[in-house]
Amino acid sequence: MKIYAVREPVFSGPTPSFQNVSNDIPLVIDNGSWQLRAGWGGEKDPKLVFDNLVSRYRDRKLSRTSTLVGNDTLIEVGSRSIARSPFERNVISNWDLMEQVLDYTFLKLGIDRMEHPICMTEPLANPTYVRSTMTELLFELYNAPSVAYGIDGLFSFYHNTKPSSSGIVLNLGNAASHVIPVLNGERILSEAKRISWGGSQSSSYLLKLFQIKYPSFPIKMLPSQAELLMHDHCHVSSDYTHDIAHALDRDILERDEIVLQFPYTEAAAQEKSQEELELIAERKRESGRRLQAQAAIKRKEKAAERDRELATLTELQQQSLVLSRRAFQRALEEAGFEDESQLNAQVKNVQAKIRRAQRDQQRQEESEGSLDVTEIDVEQAFPLLNVPDAELDEAGLRQKRHQRLMKANYDARVRAKAEKAIEEAAEAERAEADERLRLENFSTWVNEKRETHKILLEKISKNKRLKFELNDRKSHASQMRMKSLATLASEQPIQKRKRKDQSEDNFGARDEDWKVYHDVLTAEQLEEERKKLLDQIYSLEKQLLEYDSQFTQANTYDTLNDPRATLLYAFTRGVSDFDVNDVAQAFQLHLNVEQIRVPEVIFSPSIVGIDQAGILEIMRSILQRHSLEEQQKLVSNVLITGGLGSLPGMETRIKRELTSIMPVGSSINVFRASNPLLDAWKGASEWSVTEKFKAAKVTREEYLEKGPEYIKEHSLGNINS
């Protein structure tokens, strides 16, 4: 696993300025949608290379608006994000921005008056309106003496091959890609094809893939960062079907995965001494003891209050025996009751609260190990229980009621202790029988344990799935639960007096009847059931690991359900152990599948929903239109040019695919341009000093006579449509 810092475009310094040259030297401009290259004809390298962007940046402190062009958009922090391109796809759409780019170009080249012939590149099948507008701009605004246009991909082919060569140009540009056949030095534009995919779409696609892969990533990835990532770390797969199937294998991830580290700020942790830690722990314990004491006091107060309330209500009930009906009704109204039934209901309510409080106290005592009940003499501990009420005064009656509650609590604890002893004895008996079976018939014991383990895994899987579905009200499980609840709620209660023709309710006679209550389980009840199943699974796995040699750690529940073993974890976190507390890992992206998925679109545009053929299908279609001899000429020079063509593995993949469709023994030569980014300009520079350029350029006089749409056709340019 390799970790790389995410690169960002940086300002490398102001663009240098140059002196003007002789007027007879052509000005060569490679006007690309990504970068513009400009220089003088006949030279080996361009003078200017900058991004084809314009930014109007306003400095709020100085109250000044600046127009920044090219690499100068990186001077200010916020200017790059608002920069715009004159191009839409690979066609010029904003002529105001294009004019500012040309002004900047001529200014840096030292041209104060345009007296140089211009050689400018354009894309394949450039719309006539766009070319005529550019011609009008150069002649009317800049007073250019002459202009000639040529296709950028063909200029690159001109630079990298001999004159009158045959071949296929794969121009993988920034906004689109083109496949152009060339036979005996002449381009065949009627067979050329365009694919609506290039470098800008690839980087945008990579950015979207990361946004989907890491929806809650703490930092927003910029398009410029995605562009650099695509060029730095993506490559073309020689066998995409095989590689994508094994891209998430552990050994492949360890070898090829790339981790991208974004900048982060780690909060400085304040380290505490051992004494401070002990003091904090003691404070927490003291606070816990204080809260427990307060809770105990509140419980006692509430219990005493309920006892007093119950005594008052019981005394009011007993008054019905000695008072007249009218006097008793008056006493009820004074106590806030409408009738005797309301009084009885309140008595039952208070008694229920007292019983719940006793059960809660009993559970708390059981959790604290208070099931070790010490046997006591009931008559001595609760002497008032056998004394008649008539022999006791008011204080004695209250004490008797308190002893009755204490006696009930004591009896419940004794019963719980007895039940626990019975359960422990039964468990010991089952364990003894299980051990006897293991010693006497090991194969049967192992098979039973494996089958039980399989059943428990299925149960907990079903529990997990059901719990997940219950969170969705529209899921089938939620709808069935509500249906069961509605069925239970709609059942009519049984009347006290049965009619002769009324059949007796036999619900519960079958075991299946009780499954209806399992169908209406809540998420909390499912969680309790899951915990019980886990306890059984862990206990069973402990035995299997100890005695079954075929049952290994890889077969355990924790290993099978380890998120690090899932495909999703490998996709998002690779082979690393992700630590949620590690700030550095929270700012990391893992580049694995995307390394080959993004470049593959040029071969299969359907991956991103583009209904077009890939470059290999287009090449096959072109070759099928020619004779075998011409096919051999075309595949003898397959040139890859353009920014997207600089990705590693492109030549190997194309040669492999061409080998599969060409006859055995065919001479196939696939090569990358010496400089895929600059060779279009270099080819135009070489061509601009030949006689062919002089014959192909349109002079100012011809422009005035024949209009802006007039061009002269030549072997490296578009046709006049």
From Swiss-Prot:
Question: Where is it located?
Answer: Nucleus
Cellular component terms (Gene Ontology): cytoplasm; cytosol; Ino80 complex; nucleus
For this protein, the record's InterPro entries field holds: Actin, ATPase_NBD
Q: Which Gene3D superfamilies match?
A: 3.30.420.40, Actin, Chain A, domain 4
Using the UniProt record, give the first listed, main subcellular location. Answer: nucleus
Q: Look up the domain of life of the source.
A: Eukaryota
Show the coiled coil region(s).
266-368
Give a yes or no for keyword Nucleus in this entry.
yes
Q: Does the keyword Protein transport apply?
A: no
Q: Which residue ranges are recorded for the region named Disordered?
A: 486-507
| GO biological process terms held by the UniProt record | chromatin remodeling; DNA damage response; regulation of DNA-templated transcription; transcription initiation-coupled chromatin remodeling
What the entry lists under CDD domains is as follows: ASKHA_NBD_Arp5
Name the keywords, alphabetized: Chromatin regulator, Coiled coil, DNA damage, Nucleus, Transcription, Transcription regulation
Q: Which family does it belong to?
A: Belongs to the actin family.
User: What does the function comment of this entry state?
Assistant: Component of the INO80 complex which remodels chromatin by shifting nucleosomes and is involved in DNA repair.
The UniProt subunit note reads as follows: Component of the INO80 chromatin remodeling complex.
State what protein this is by name: Actin-like protein arp5
* Natural source organism: Schizosaccharomyces pombe (strain 972 / ATCC 24843) (Fission yeast)
Taxonomic placement: Eukaryota, Fungi, Dikarya, Ascomycota, Taphrinomycotina
